[in-house]
Amino acid sequence: MVTAKMVKELRERTGAGMMDCKKALTETDGDMEKAVEFLREKGLAAAAKKAGRVAAEGLVTTYLSEDNKTAVALEVNCETDFVSINESFVEFTNSIAKQIATSDVKDVEELLESKYIADENVTVKEALTALIAKIGENMNIRRFEKLTIDNGVINGYVHGEGRIGVLVELGCEKESDILMPLAKDIAMQVAAANPLFLDETSVDEEALDKEREIYRAQALNEGKPEKIVEKMVEGRVKKYLKEVCLIDQVWVKNSDYTIKKLLEEKSKEVGSPITLCKFVRFERGEGLEKKEENFAEEVQRQMNQK
């Protein structure tokens, strides 16, 4: 059964009209992902809106070691934006990011059982439980990623008071003052342009085949002759790759440059090749469903806690 809530979610994810969303869900027996594909094939949904919508509160933060060789991106979730800017919550999140960077923990489960860096008398799990009791709101250490490099640097960028956090790893045999600002610029690019892949070699073939099928269906629905459909599909695939591969994206600070061209020019300045090794991009609440609440009731609940 197709519900109003399902139609609302599909509209938010695709930007398509209400009746189109209802039809898509009906045609796909209520399967949300298939409904998104259905709308795209009909040309009714933008490819850029395919990713899961952001619907949870919390904080994304980054931590960089003093030598810029180790870095961490971390997401900690909470229920409301009031808590995401709470001083105790922010301090806890920053402490956890530092703890991950300075320890060998491999995942969230191992992290929770380890001694808390700010108070070794308790575990991270116990510290989190105490913070939940103090603030009166559920919290969760959702995910983290740690990067390390020997030859090169790592820099980060946090956007929108912890809404998006990015790390960029640049490899280079020579040390240079150019590297850190360059990594920061590319991190800002990642935050703004949201690339899905580093370059074409890292593109998931299954995902690419899916895009081809969608473009093929779009072309056929437009009434294009079969003989030119394949050319159209490949043209759209090339455009898609330039949009989703970081190395091929147009630089947001100067449209005369792609990221590849920017790296080539900076490599000449440094006198040694600069390699874009990896990037990490966390967006707060990606793929999480936020419980819908009356705003006035939420404010009242926060006031009652004071």
Swiss-Prot record:
* Compartment(s): Cytoplasm
**Principal localisation:** cytoplasm
Gene Ontology MF annotations: translation elongation factor activity
Question: Mind telling me which InterPro entries this protein's record contains?
Answer: EF-Ts_dimer_sf (IPR036402), Transl_elong_EFTs/EF1B (IPR001816), Transl_elong_EFTs/EF1B_dimer (IPR014039), Transl_elong_Ts_CS (IPR018101), UBA-like_sf (IPR009060)
Q: Which GO terms describe its cellular component?
A: cytoplasm
Q: Which UniProt keywords apply?
A: Cytoplasm, Elongation factor, Protein biosynthesis
Gene3D superfamilies from the xrefs?
1.10.286.20, DNA helicase RuvA subunit, C-terminal domain, Elongation factor Ts, dimerisation domain
State the residue spans of region: Involved in Mg(2+) ion dislocation from EF-Tu.
80-83
Lineage, top-rank taxon, reads Bacteria
Function of this protein?
A: Associates with the EF-Tu.GDP complex and induces the exchange of GDP to GTP. It remains bound to the aminoacyl-tRNA.EF-Tu.GTP complex up to the GTP hydrolysis stage on the ribosome.
Family designation = Belongs to the EF-Ts family.
Name the UniProt record assigns to this protein: Elongation factor Ts
Q: Which organism's genome codes for this protein?
A: Clostridium novyi (strain NT)
Q: What is the lineage of its organism?
A: Bacteria, Bacillati, Bacillota, Clostridia, Eubacteriales
Which gene holds the coding sequence for this protein?
A: tsf
